[in-house]
Amino acid sequence: MVQLLEHYFSEQGAGQARYRLMRRRASNEQRSWRYLDIINRMIDRPGGRSYRVILLGLFATLLQAKGTLRLDKDARPLLLIEDPETRLHPIMLSVAWHLLNLLPLQRIATTNSGELLSLTPVEHVCRLVRESSRVAAWRLGPSGLSTEDSRRISFHIRFNRPSSLFARCWLLVEGETETWVINELARQCGHHFDAEGIKVIEFAQSGLKPLVKFARRMGIEWHVLVDGDEAGKKYAATVRSLLNNDREAEREHLTALPALDMEHFMYRQGFSDVFHRVAQIPENVPMNLRKVISKAIHRSSKPDLAIEVAMEAGRRGVDSVPTLLKKMFSRVLWLARGRAD
């Protein structure tokens, strides 16, 4: 244990201390002491008991792995960690990972924890996908993402939706309304997206292109649902450009609503009575559908209105779910099952 500690924080072997100190460059020496200082301050401060326990366990593991071999002064042990979330509370997992990041170690960890993924830069994540005849590994690679795209993905996926990195397919929708409607209507059709590895993700905040580029690089299938308004047409054009205007690929990856937005689409698909009821406007009152929808949103909210429509579809049965959405569900399930084991 003494020799291992000396390897990291002083020198390898007490007898060679003076000789090695003279040979080592000043920058390396300062770095070693900086690591030691950081760890000392961490374990000495109030509430540092958890750090001390982790540090002792770590060094015990390293000592057992080292055996009687003498480590080179530039050696950096490779620490393999298998599913640490199975033994650690999420808070302790965060503490342990933070401590490991301070040590000059190489680390490979396998995990099914979104909590751990949220602590790891996406550039350091490698997805393992079990296919019919092999296990494929997907990662961003040396070129990675642009600085702006990396920032957007980190905020939208890593920090807010880390579990989506385990998904087989992303269904990308414009906003919260579509998220509520699509999840509920899929459930009523007997499709359990969570069990199929499908994640519905809104893209308006982060932008569509970064999400699609990231999904492709990480081996995640994807499908995009867009509105029929001007913004939706631009999103559709973005998808087509990413697919090199391949018509067959477009059928697999793009669904466009034949209406301005989800509210107008569902109104025309037989749910006008829901909008009139929420807007408190009798159906026999002549009024432009845009005004009816606007009043319904004003008296409720877009997400609440979407939930009302979805619940009404549940009461009416599967036949009330628009055919366009049923076809989209089938495509998304097909994409997801193509990645199934």
Question: What is each of the regions a protein language model found here?
Answer:
Residues 305-341:
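Terminal low-complexity/disordered tails
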Residues 1-25:
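Amphipathic alpha-helical domain-onset/packing element
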Residues 4-11, 62-63, 160, 185-192, ...:
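Conserved, well-folded catalytic cores of nucleic-acid-processing
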Residues 34-160, 237, 334:
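Switch/communication elements of ASCE P-loop NTPase nucleotide-binding domains
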Residues 77-83, 199-202, 254-256:
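Extended hydrophobic secondary-structure segments that form protein cores and membrane-embedded regions
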Residues 24-36:
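Active-site-adjacent bridging/hinge elements
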Residues 234-308:
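Activity-critical C-terminal alpha-helical subdomain
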Residues 117-118, 123-231:
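RecA-like P-loop NTPase motor core
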